Amino acid sequence: MARGVNKVILVGTCGQDPEVRYLPNGNAVTNLSLATSEQWTDKQTGQKVERTEWHRVSLFGKVAEIAGEYLRKGSQCYIEGKLQTREWEKDGIKRYTTEIIVDMQGTMQLLGGRPQNQQQGGDPYNQGGSNQQPRQQAPRQQRPQQPPAPQQPAQPAADFDSFDDDIPFMDPYRFNWHLQ
C-alpha cells in the first residue's frame, strides 16, 4: 500500500523572470514565483473578490534549463511537482519555507503565446548564455509565401443510415450468471 501521495498541479503566471543557476555538478536549478488567482462574488456586498496566491517553484535539470530559457515575467505555464518544506536557522531563529519541486518526475509546460508585455517585432526568448547578460533580440524571419492550394471537389456526405451491421455488444441476458 502507498504511504501517501505528494503531487501539486498549478496553472499560473510567472511574477518575474526566472533565476537560473548551476550546481557544482553542472545541473541547472531555476527558481520562479508563480501566481494563481481565484475569483468569487462576496455574498454580503455582491462585489467580485479576487485572491492571488504566490507559489515558490524550484525546477531541476533539463526542465530548469528550458524554463530559464523560455519563461518570462507574465508567461503562463503548467507545473506538476511535489511539495517540499525546507528548514534553516538564521540569527538563532528557525525558518521554514514550502515550495513546489519540479524534478525528473515533474512537468513544466509553456501555455499560451508570448507574454503580453513583449513587443511584436523581436524574439523575447533568451538565445543562450546566463541570465546576467542583457538579452538580444533576433531579427524576425518571414516565412516564404506559398501559392494557395487548389480546391478539391466537394465529396458527398457519408450515409450512416445504410449501415446494417449489428451492434457489437454481447447480450448480458444470454449468459447464466453464477454468483455465489
From Swiss-Prot:
Gene3D superfamilies: Nucleic acid-binding proteins
Pfam families given in the database record: SSB
Keywords noted in UniProt: DNA-binding, Plasmid
Domain named SSB: residues: 5-109
Keyword DNA-binding: yes
MF annotations from Gene Ontology: single-stranded DNA binding
Domain of life according to the entry: Bacteria
Summary of subunit composition and partner proteins: Homotetramer.
Family annotation (PROSITE patterns): SSB
GO cellular component: nucleoid
Compositional bias segments (type: Polar residues): 115-131
InterPro entries: NA-bd_OB-fold, Primosome_PriB/ssb, ssDNA-bd
CDD domains: SSB_OBF
Name of encoding gene: ssb
Disulphide bridges, residue numbers: none
Chain segments carrying region Disordered: 111-180
Keyword DNA-binding annotated: yes
Gene source species: Pseudomonas putida (Arthrobacter siderocapsulatus)
Protein name, as recorded: Single-stranded DNA-binding protein
